[in-house]
Amino acid sequence: MLTQIINGKILTPQGWLKDGSVLISDNKILEVTNCDLAVVGATLIDAKGMYIVPGGVEIHVHGGGGRDFMEGTEEAFRAAVAAHMQHGTTSIFPTLSSSTIPMIREAAATTEKLMAEKDSPVLGLHLEGHYFNMKMAGGQLPENIKNPDPEEYIPLLEETHCIKRWDAAPELPGAMQFGKYVTSKGVLASVGHTQAEYEDIQTAYEAGYTHATHFYNAMPGFHKRREYKYEGTVESIYLIDDMTVEVVADGIHVPPTILRLVYKIKGVERTCLITDALACAASDSQTAFDPRVIIEDGVCKLADRSALAGSITTMDRLIRTMVQKAEIPLEDAVRMASETPARIMGVYDRKGSLQRGKDADIQILDKDLNVRAVWAMGKLVEGTNKLF
């Protein structure tokens, strides 16, 4: 089956292509060309002058559509994934916050089942914790937080192959051994919920930690002790040129001015956008899965208002925030939501850009950057056909 999308501004790795077309054959991109002549036998989609861009690659998300990945069930996973696909996400790494090993095993079993399905948007499991600094726990469950334990993580990574990312605080005892081990298994090691200083971050990077979890959140910046000033985790990460970062670009977790600063220092190639969304995202629900969490001012907070606890945002809102509030070019905002996370997670060979031979993960955005249509693996996502 052939589908041809014409009459739109197409974002390619080389820049914008005007008046061209994207030809889809089953689940792959057959061609991206500057010719928009109709192909015989193809179903024609008129983009009506809108933006044709890659689908979003979400690497840090806890739930959506009223369901949380911590539930561990197939029903919850499918509902949350479907909710985010309505907003332009076409690839997703479900995230668990600090959990018990039985909870991780249940979620891993569900993840593996979904990954095995043909054309699945689920690409792997992300573990946010539970090896964190208790002082920087934020919305994490404190009773689950502990130091890295090889008697836990080695058997877990031996028995399952769906875990693609695992976050930890590098200053903890055993964190360097943990980083070296998980990266030896092809798992992305990320620093998060940490008070690490420059020496910690430098050593962590050398041990395999190449990424930073929700940059600026749950980590200190520049600070004073008595009369002296010290760099924080934030500045330390800036100083490691090749370290990648992710930002919750809802304009609340990180203000637009700081989003622009991250963009200017780390650049498109080392900055990706994440929702860090909870169950209430992409839904009418005003109740979080975690009873400790309230929704107020358009964000999730701990009930005592001591910390933010996640977002209610979606991928399309991240792009709008970066463009409309942080004043970043649309092409760069889209790349940070697609190409960069795909590179970070090692799936850029098939995801993250509109190129011949890649998976047909495509979204169409109107002039206000609202989602008007989404294709995941060449199939139109139900409920997104707002062009027709």
Whereabouts are the PLM-identified features?
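Alpha-helical scaffold segments that flank or form the walls of functional sites
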Residues: 50-52, 59, 69-121, 144-159, ...
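Divalent metal-dependent hydrolysis catalytic cores, especially in the metallo-beta-lactamase
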Residues: 62, 78-107, 120-133, 160-171, ...
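C-terminal cap of metal-dependent C-N hydrolases
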Residues: 8, 288, 343, 353-388
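Conserved, mostly hydrophobic/aromatic
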Residues: 127, 182, 212, 322, ...
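Active-site core of metal-dependent hydrolases
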Residues: 158-283
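His/Asp/Glu-enriched, well-ordered alpha-helical/loop segment
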Residues: 229-247, 263-275, 280-365
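Active-site gating loops and adjacent loop-to-helix segments of metal-dependent hydrolytic enzymes
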Residues: 82-93, 134-160, 203-244, 284-308, ...
